[in-house]
UniProtKB/Swiss-Prot annotation:
Cofactor: heme b
Transmembrane segments: 34-54, 78-99, 114-134, 179-199, 227-247, 289-309, 321-341, 348-368
GO cellular component: mitochondrial inner membrane; respiratory chain complex III
Protein name: Cytochrome b
Ligand binding (heme b b566): H98, H197
Main location: mitochondrion
Encoding gene (name): MT-CYB
An example molecular function term from Gene Ontology annotations: metal ion binding
SUPFAM superfamilies per record: a domain/subunit of cytochrome bc1 complex (Ubiquinol-cytochrome c reductase), Transmembrane di-heme cytochromes
GO terms for biological process, alphabetical: mitochondrial electron transport, ubiquinol to cytochrome c
Length: 380
């Protein structure tokens, strides 16, 4: 019998074992679609970003007008830019849902996969932040100033670190050029990390909605899940193109249509919607270093979730108390997101502080306590 190239060729073998003959749990739901959606988001962002970079000039005097030129004079430049800007929002929607799925179904017990995933989230956040600075509008400039300034809270080396990051004594041309370099580099780093993420995942195989081993019932990835993924792509591209074509600036800040001016501070400096929850946590502590630590902890706390799993069951499918806690956490994150977009005044200050406290309490205290309590109730 002639050798099957798909199974014998060194490169095709890799593709085959990851996308074609991969044994997959038969009962994984649509919540398992977000991994592939993140992959397609990354590809879309790299492609549109590359096309934008060909027309972009990383210079403070030209950056803003080069972006305007792309939108006005380049063939479909407006569409490429709108897809890139809104693609970032969809990237974050997908990653947050992906993390939520992992949290709900106990996928974090694949520790290496989970930890590389958290590193991927951090890399994505860094990429989105430096990318937001590039159009060099008012919010770009002041966002860069405020967020980079947070590093000055680090004792002893803080100020030196900030000036080193800026390439001077304020956010200026050197900052913009290095941010462009970083924004170009990081997505490829994300792609490499995603490969590692998948390698770790395929060591143990995918989890499933019941949180039980599925070795007895696996089906090949292709055609079943390849088709399901393509359906997912279509369902995601529909709202993305709708947003990019009909209301491309819905999620942006009007302040960014004004070129950066170091002499005029915008009335409300706030990041894009996907960072608002972390921004609210940062603002809820009236001390600079404390706020920075809370901001870092808001994401880094995800590294602790595998250690805080006290339940004898993996998923929350059959744990109503944990489910209640999970949805409380989701509602709490939405409250934080809303508070982050509001000015720093009463009642938003106290709401933000309570929501921040609740966020950490649920993750660090209540989840392990409720997990242990459920074990007791089930006589485990």
């Amino acid at each position: 019998m002639a050798p099957n190239l798909r199974k014998s060729h060194p490169l095709l073998k890799l593709v085959n074992n990851s996308l074609i003959d991969l044994p997959t749990p038969s009962n994984i739901s649509a919540w398992w679609n977000f991994g592939s959606l993140l992959g397609i988001c990354l590809l879309t962002q790299i492609l549109t970003g590359l096309l934008l970079a060909t027309h972009y000039t990383a210079d403070t005097t030209l950056a803003f007008s080069s972006v305007a030129h792309t939108c006005r004079n380049v063939q479909y430049g407006w569409l490429i830019r709108n897809l890139h800007a809104n693609g970032a929002s969809f990237f974050f929607i997908c990653i947050y849902l992906h993390i939520g799925r992992g949290f709900y179904y106990g996928s974090y017990l694949n520790k290496e996969t989970w930890n590389t995933g958290v590193i991927l989230l951090l890399a994505l956040m860094a990429t989105a932040f430096v990318g937001y600075v590039l159009p060099w509008g008012q919010m770009s400039f002041w966002g860069a100033t405020v967020i980079t300034n947070l590093f000055s809270a680090i004792p002893y080396i803080g100020q030196t670190l900030v000036e080193w990051a800026w390439g001077g004594f304020s956010v200026d041309n050197p900052t913009l050029t290095r941010f462009f370099a970083l924004h170009f580099l990081l997505p490829f780093m994300i792609a490499g990390l995603a490969f590692i993420h998948l390698t770790f995942l395929h060591e143990s195989g995918s989890n499933n909605p019941l949180g039980i081993p599925s070795n007895c019932d696996k089906i090949p990835f292709h055609p079943y899940f390849s088709l399901k993924d393509i359906l997912g792509f279509i369902i995601m591209f529909l709202p993305l193109t709708t947003l990019a074509l009909f209301s491309p600036n819905l999620l942006g800040d009007p302040e960014n249509f004004t070129p950066a001016n170091p002499l005029v501070t915008p009335p409300h400096i706030k990041p894009e919607w996907y960072f608002l929850f972390a921004y609210a946590i940062l603002r809820s502590i009236p001390n600079k270093l404390g706020g920075v630590l809370a901001l870092a902890a808001s994401v880094l706390v995800l590294f602790l979730t595998p250690l805080l799993h006290k339940s004898k069951q993996r998923a929350m499918t059959f744990r109503p108390l944990s489910q209640l806690l999970f949805w409380t956490l989701v509602a709490n994150l939405l409250i934080l997101t809303w508070v982050g977009s509001q000015p720093v005044e009463h009642p938003f200050i106290i709401i933000g502080q309570l929501a921040s406290l609740t966020y950490f309490t649920i993750l660090l205290l209540l989840f392990p306590i409720i997990g242990a309590l459920e074990n007791k109730m089930l006589n485990y």
